[in-house]
């Protein structure tokens, strides 16, 4: 199959996509926009596509999920193409690295031993393997290797989990609740904008820790709260439109009453 045939091959799979990307990045005949992109310039798109995958999952839209997973795969192919051009890595070496990692992290699956390990022992092995991986990357500190690019709440929980492994953690949830109350007081007493900024961050960090102790994913919890707010406010708007009004023509008293009405209808 020649190159043009591969571009239009309906069942060309990953090789088809890799060839399309090479064509887009071709310095002589490629797309000017695609040619000038770098790891850094497409990084925001990589994050955006990952969130769009999550959005499709949460909406249970499987047709859209297929497309969004393709968009996310394109980001991996894009980074791989840039890496290949710079002699760093290519798509196949990326696949080999993650394959090796998965095999190494699952000795209970990929070894010849017939002895089954308990879930607790598997977790211990997993943590030991990850610790060895961090050491290989010279990540010797307890908090080394927690990605800076993670959503802030997710990163907070990961940092707290790492600290907890070495004993730096509150033993009971009541202690975390006391700290939440303390941080709220410090926020209300903050005088400057910079101080309020700092204290609000401290409060959010402790709330993430509270979520961790309660075994709640704070990112998912906040996403659910966002969806609930969107659903309820949209219903408030619908009720206003039905009355011949709009949010801008209404007032807080009326909208608050409608909000409580919507809440009551959900119960």
Predicted regions and their residues:
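Flexible "arm" and connector segments at domain edges
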Residues: 1-68, 74-200, 204-267
């Amino acid at each position: 199959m020649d190159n043009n045939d591969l571009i239009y091959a309906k069942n060309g799979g990953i090789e088809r996509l890799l060839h399309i990307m090479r064509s887009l990045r071709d310095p002589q005949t490629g797309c000017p926009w695609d040619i000038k992109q770098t790891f850094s310039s497409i990084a925001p798109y990589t994050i955006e596509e990952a969130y769009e995958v999550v959005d499709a999952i949460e909406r249970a839209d499987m047709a859209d999920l297929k497309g969004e997973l393709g968009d996310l795969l394109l980001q991996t192919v894009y980074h791989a193409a840039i890496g290949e051009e710079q002699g760093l890595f290519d798509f196949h070496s990326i696949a080999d690295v993650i394959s090796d990692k998965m095999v190494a992290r699952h000795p209970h699956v990929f070894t010849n031993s017939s002895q089954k390990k308990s879930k607790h022992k598997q977790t211990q092995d997993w943590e030991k393997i990850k610790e060895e991986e961090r050491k290989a990357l010279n990540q010797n500190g307890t908090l080394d290797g927690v990605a800076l690019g993670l959503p802030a709440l997710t990163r907070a929980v990961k940092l707290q989990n790492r600290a907890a492994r070495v004993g730096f953690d509150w033993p009971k949830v009541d202690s975390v609740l006391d700290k939440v109350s303390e941080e709220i007081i410090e926020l209300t007493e903050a005088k400057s904008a910079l101080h309020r900024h700092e204290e609000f961050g401290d409060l959010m960090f402790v709330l993430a820790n509270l979520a961790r102790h309660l075994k709640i994913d704070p990112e998912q919890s906040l996403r659910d709260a966002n969806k609930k707010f969107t659903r309820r406010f949209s219903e408030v708007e619908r009720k206003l439109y039905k009355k011949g009004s709009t949010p801008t023509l209404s007032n807080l008293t009326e909208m608050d009453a409608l909000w409580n009405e919507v809440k009551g209808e959900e119960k």
